[in-house]
Amino acid sequence: MIGNQPNVNNLDVNLEELVLPVSLLADEELSPDGDPEEEEHYPYTIDTCCKPCGAGVRFTIIATPSAVITLRQLLLQEVFLTCLRCSRSLFRHGRS
């Protein structure tokens, strides 16, 4: 400020020093704070039934708890398993 009484005309502001260079923002990248924490993998046994005949189907997986939740949702809604007998009769061991 210049003068005894402050007013807008007395402001001595150099705005060029406050403006960031364009390349600083355009080329800016955020560095990761660290590796994301990896979830532990655990063994799970899944009991379900064969869609065509209703026989019991059991299998074991090693997965994270969140993956097991996703698999559970798939098995309850969209994905159906078959037993070995139905698989052989439906797909004839991969032969057409």
Swiss-Prot record:
Q: Which organism is it from?
A: Human papillomavirus type 60
Q: Name the UniProt key words of this record, in alphabetical order.
A: Activator, DNA-binding, Early protein, G1/S host cell cycle checkpoint dysregulation by virus, Host cytoplasm, Host nucleus, Host-virus interaction, Inhibition of host innate immune response by virus, Inhibition of host interferon signaling pathway by virus, Interferon antiviral system evasion, Metal-binding, Modulation of host cell cycle by virus, Oncogene, Transcription, Transcription regulation, Viral immunoevasion, Zinc, Zinc-finger
Compartments in which it is found: Host cytoplasm; Host nucleus
Gene3D superfamilies (alphabetical):
3.30.160.330
Tell me a GO biological process for this protein.
Answer: DNA-templated transcription
Domain observations: The E7 terminal domain is an intrinsically disordered domain, whose flexibility and conformational transitions confer target adaptability to the oncoprotein. It allows adaptation to a variety of protein targets and exposes the PEST degradation sequence that regulates its turnover in the cell.
Q: Which residues form the signal peptide?
A: none
Q: Which SUPFAM superfamilies match?
A: E7 C-terminal domain-like (SSF161234)
Q: List the residue ranges of the region (E7 terminal domain).
A: 1-42
Motif Nuclear export signal: positions = 68-76
Assembly with partners or alone: Homodimer. Homooligomer. Interacts with host RB1; this interaction induces dissociation of RB1-E2F1 complex thereby disrupting RB1 activity. Interacts with host EP300; this interaction represses EP300 transcriptional activity. Interacts with protein E2; this interaction inhibits E7 oncogenic activity. Interacts with host TMEM173/STING; this interaction impairs the ability of TMEM173/STING to sense cytosolic DNA and promote the production of type I interferon (IFN-alpha and IFN-beta).
Q: What is this protein called?
A: Protein E7
Any GO molecular function: zinc ion binding
Family under the similarity heading: Belongs to the papillomaviridae E7 protein family.
PTM per Swiss-Prot/TrEMBL: Highly phosphorylated.
Q: Name one GO cellular component term.
A: host cell cytoplasm
Per its UniProt record, what Pfam families does this chain match? E7 (PF00527)
User: Where does each unnamed zinc finger lie?
Assistant: 50-86
* Function in brief: Plays a role in viral genome replication by driving entry of quiescent cells into the cell cycle. Stimulation of progression from G1 to S phase allows the virus to efficiently use the cellular DNA replicating machinery to achieve viral genome replication. E7 protein has both transforming and trans-activating activities. Induces the disassembly of the E2F1 transcription factor from RB1, with subsequent transcriptional activation of E2F1-regulated S-phase genes. Interferes with host histone deacetylation mediated by HDAC1 and HDAC2, leading to transcription activation.
